[in-house]
């Protein structure tokens, strides 16, 4: 494969992509059944009988919905009571004639018409805690489906975007992100295009800053700067209130840090200096998560879960690639955590994913090409509580 294809915005690479896209479209659209298949798929995607997929936040259920009347989609919410009452079957097994009562928050078709932009939905983060819980959200929108998007803060009480002039959080178009940084909604974690030298070769921002309302990105404290040749830098605050910083040296590896509350950070003035350096710069108070760079580590409750892509020998025990292991987070950070194997692959079964509920860890497995779920109930190390 020619090296010039690695140039994400290179004219030669983009021309090559356009040429091959056109050839592929011609081949696919020229088949005899193309129109029939497209019509059948559109009917399925636009069906009103679909079960709305919901996400819970601050006591409400949120859903993004598209259909023939709303091709770009509606972002809406409802209550548990309304959603359950209109389910296919009630608890007693009887059919329900009720209809879920949805509150439309954003109509992307209307928004696009009013602003003259074809907005494509890239997701939203509802504030889950504090006095503004369920009343503010950070919404990501892409112009025409581009990889780049913008973030805008919306007042969910009024459905109105809060302009920066009124203190609303806002991010210009980039492959970056904004994420809530505290319980009150007064600060955000900002990963933004800050101009020359701030983007990686892959086009992702290299720097994470924490901003207060009214601050520009240049004024925010610096939490992390990825190395010049890394894929980029990322940050998020989990539902237990912990702040995580991440770099990806390449597509297959990552480095992870926990930033404790009140930990020392770097002043705004260090930003340009850090961007000019070749190596990674991280806040002095951040704690590195010492796992293989090929692994994926995440914290659930007060446990650290580590998904392995390569064999890992710890304390004389080798955990094979494909395993999911865990340790109490506090003990692991102190160098004392003994790893527990939660899942070890076999000749027929491997782990495809996992998710945490309020009290259980649900593993999704594929065993002899058959999906299966396994529910684990780990002991708790402490009183860490999640947000809904």
Give the residues covered by each predicted segment.
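Short mixed-charge
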Residues: 82-98
